[in-house]
Amino acid sequence: MDRDPFSRCHPAVQFLFFLGAIGFGVVIQHPAYLLAGWVAAAGYYLLLHGPGGWRQVIMWLPVFVALTVLNPLFNPRGEHVLFTIFGRPYTGEALAYGGVIAGVFVVMMLWFGCYNRVMTSDKFMCLFGNWAPSLSLLLVMVFRLVPRFFRQTRQLIGARRSVGKGTGKGYRDKVAAGMTVLSAMTSWALEGSVITAASMRSRGYGSARRSCFQVFRVTAGDRLLLVMMLALLAAVLGTATLGGMAADFIPQLSFAPISGGYAWGFLAYCSYLLIPTVLHFREALHWHILRSRI
C-alpha cells in the first residue's frame, strides 16, 4: 500500500487538486502566491521522493537564476535601468519579471514531478479512458515520456561507458557522443510510441467501454476533500476576479496587497496547496500516537 495518504484518494480528487495547483500556478504571477506555490510544491515533492528529492529541487535553482538573469537581455522595458549591456538597458522591472517567469517554470516542474508520482497511468485511464480513449492514451504516453526518456538516457550512457565509448575528454568527442545518444533516444521514443499504439489497437482498445485495471471507490473522505477543494478554489477564483492577485511589472512594479479581504484569498490558496502535505503529516502523527500506546 502507498505510504502517501493523498495517493490513496480517488483519482478524481487527485486530478482536481493538480488541475487547480497547476492551472492557477501558471496564470498567477503575484510573488507572494508564487512563493507559496514553490514551498508547497517543493515540500510535497520531498515527501514523495524522500531524501533523494533534494537533488532535483536543488537542481532547479541554477535554472531559476539563469532564466531570471537572461530575461532583461531580451526584454529591456522598465523604468529603473541598472546598467547597460551591448547598448541595451538592463532594467530592474525586467529582472523581476524574469524571476517570476522562472519561478512559475520551476514550480510547474515540481508539481508535474508530484503528478507523475501520484497520478499513475491506470488512474488517468480510469477517469478518461471511456470518455476519450485516444486522447487519454496520448496524454498518458506524453506524461510518461519525460521521466522514462531521462531514465533510459542514463542507462544508455552507462552502457556506452561500460564498453569504453563516450569517455572522450575533447570537445569534439563529447559533441559526437551526445549526438549519438540523442539519435538513439529519438529512435527509441518513436519506436516505443508506434509499438504502444499497435499493441493497444490489437487489444481492441477504444472499440468499446472497458473496465479499469484497479477498482477505485469514492469514500466519505473523498467526498469531503472534493467539497473542501471546490470551496477553496471558489474563494481563490473570487479573489482573482476582484483583483487580489494583480501583479504589474512594466513599466513599474505594482502588486495587489495581501491584506484585508484579499488575505482570505491568499489563505485559501495556501490551504488548497497544502492539502496533500497536511494529510501526510496527519497520518504520520496518527501512527506515532498509535505506536506510542503499544
Question: Which residue stretches match the model-derived regions?
Answer:
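Structured inter-helical modules in multipass membrane proteins
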Residues: 108-217
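N-terminal transmembrane hairpin
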Residues: 1-126, 207-294
